[in-house]
Amino acid sequence: MRLSVRELVEFVLRDGDIDNRNADPERMAEGSRIHRRIQREQGDCYEAEVSLSLTVDYEGITYTVEGRADGILTTGEGVLVDEIKTTALPLEEIDGENRVHWGQVLCYAYMVARQRSLPRLEVQLTYCRRETGEIRRFVRPYAFEQLETFFQDLLFQYRMWAEMQEEWDGIRDASIRDLPFPFSSYRPGQRQLAAAVYRTVRDEGRLLCQAPTGIGKTISTLYPAVKALGEGYTEKLFYLTAKTITRQATMDACEKMAAQGLRLRTIVLTAKDKICFCRDADGNRNGECNPDGCPYAKGHFSRVNDALYDLLGRCDLYSRAAVEACAREHRVCPFELQLDATLWCDCIVGDYNYLFDPQVYLRRFFDIPQGAYTFLIDEAHNLGDRAREMYSASLSKSTAWAVKKALHKKEALTRALAALNKAFLALREGDTEERTVTREAAADTLLSPLNQVADETALWLKTHPGAPEEDAVLSLYFDVLRYLKVAELYDGHYRTLLTFAKGDITIRQFCVDPSALLSGCLSKGRSAVFFSATLTPLPYY
C-alpha cells in the first residue's frame, strides 16, 4: 500500500471541528515563497525539500510511505529535521501543540533516522507569520526508539483501513476479470472506440475522440477503462463532465455493469453549495463552516472516520442521497465526507473543476507529481471555454470599498482596504474615459495590498464570528484569494482587462490560452481520453 506522510498522519490524528475561521486557505504559492526564503537563510548545512520514501512490512501488509521534508540541518552537534508552516495568526496564538504538524515532522524524522542509522536527532516546527515575516520555532529531541514507536502506532491505527482496502482490491479485480460488456451487442463504431480507449490507458497515452451522438460514449469509454483498471494499468478513474445529466448517465452505466457482477466503488461528487445541510430561511447555504454556525462542523473530525467506514460498507455506488443519509446519521459534514470517500473509491465522477480549477481541485490526489490515474473527459468541446473561466479572475474597487464602509470603525482591515482602494485608483494612470482597456502586463502593483487584505480578512473572520458584516467579508476574502491564485499563473497566455465605468474600476486577469495549464493538470495522471460528438476543427482542440 502506497500513501503519503500527510495522508497517513492527517487520517489517523485528525480530531475536533471544521472551522473555516481558523483556516489558512489556499495561500500555497505564497507559502512556498516563504518556505524558500526561510530555507535559504539556514546556510549550507541545511538541505531543503528532501524527498523521502520508506517501505516497511507491518503485520502482514507492505507500506510505502512517501513525503518531502522541508529541511534537514546537519551540524557537528547532530541532525535536525525541520517542518515549516505559514500562518496568518499572531505567533503568540501558536501553542506548538498541533498533533498533525508534529505527526508529519516525526514521520520525516523517523525516515531520516532509519536511512542514516541515527540513534537520536531533533525535530523542529517553524511557524512564520505571513504578514510580518516573524518566526517562532519549537524544538524537541527524540531517540530513534521513540520515533519508531510513534510510526508503528500510526500504522497500527491505519491497519484496519489497509486490510479493508487489500480485501476490496481482490474482490474488485475478480469481478472485473469476469465482467462482460453490459449489452447484448456493440453498436456500430462502439467496439472500435472501446478498443482505442483500452489501448490508451494501457499505453499511458492521450486520446482525442469524436463520436456521433447515440453511439453510447459513456459505456464505450467507461467499460474499457474499468477493464484496464482490473489489469493494473491504472489505479483510479476520474470521469469528468460539465453537465449534471451526464454525471447521472455515468452512474447509470456503473449500475448497468454492477448488474453484470461488477464491484467498483464509484462516487458522484456534489458541489458544496448543493450538498451542505446548513441553510438559511430562504434555503441558501449560510456558509458557516464552523462549530458555532453548523452542528455538523462541531466535532466532525472526531466522528468522520466512523462515518466513512460505515458508508464504504453500505454499498458500492455512492450517490448524493447515500452520502447525505450517512452524514446525517453520524452528524458530519456531507461535503467533507464525500471528499474523504474518494480516497477509497475506484471511480470518481464529477465536474471538470475537480481536476482543472486552481481553487477547488482535489488536492489529496493532484498535489503529488503524478498518480496512476486515468481521466475520462466527456463533452470535451466545452473544456476550452470552461478553462478560460477557471483560470481567470476579476475584482472591482467598489466591492472592496463597500466592505470598508460596512466595517465603520478604523482597524487593520479597513486600513488594508483603504490601501487597496488607492492602488485601484492608480491603475487609471491619468485615463479619465469610461472604457475597457487591454494590457499585456499584469497589474503587479495590486499584489502587495491584496496580500495584506487577505491576511487581515483571515484575522478579522477569526476574531469576529457572527458579525453582521461576516458574509460580505468572507465573500471578498474568497474573491481576493482567487485573484491572487490566478496572479501566480499569469504569463504570456494572459491579458489584463481594465474597465473604467461610473466611478468604478474592475480588473480582470483573463486567460486567453489555457492549453499549457490544462496540460499541466493532465500530467497529474497517466492517461486521458477526451470525447465528444463535436471536436471540429480538430487542430484547434
Feature annotation, model-predicted:
Residues 323-348, 358-366, 459-541:
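A contiguous, basic/glycine-rich beta-loop/short-helix subdomain that forms a polymer-engagement track
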Residues 173-176, 180, 233-348, 356, ...:
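A substrate-engagement module of RecA-like helicase motors
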Residues 198-199, 218-233, 252-257:
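Walker A/P-loop NTP-binding motif
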Residues 202-224:
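Walker A/P-loop
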Residues 167-210:
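Conserved pre-motif I regulatory segment
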Residues 221, 248, 252, 328-347, ...:
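Signature of the SF2 helicase/ATPase Hel1-core->accessory helical subdomain module
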Residues 54-148:
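Mg2+/Mn2+-dependent nuclease catalytic core
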Residues 1-78, 99:
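Metal-dependent nuclease catalytic cores that hydrolyze phosphodiester bonds in DNA/RNA
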